């Protein structure tokens, strides 16, 4: 017989099921490490920087400040105690004219970062849903063909 009873295993399962995404990701420090890698990755991605507006923004905005706001936003969206204090996604991205292909590159970078840190599938799916909820405010709709 092992050192754990069935009751304690059931308790562990129940605790894991009731924890917020924020808690399951390890809290602000773990989230900040992942965001740090992700922002470093997107700041130099040639697929994103091919858009001159994005490239200019990447050179105008402090990477450290960008990392702060993204960390704050992820923590807030994942159920942490933080409150996002940055601009709306629409206001922050409206002038960048981000295309669907650039969104795809951004998502690819995001998935590479999650894989690097071994983020489990359940948490990846929840993070994907959070990111996907911002797409309509970030991607500029294509102009209709004339």
Residue ranges, per PLM feature:
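Core of compact, soluble alpha-helical bundle domains
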Residues: 2-146
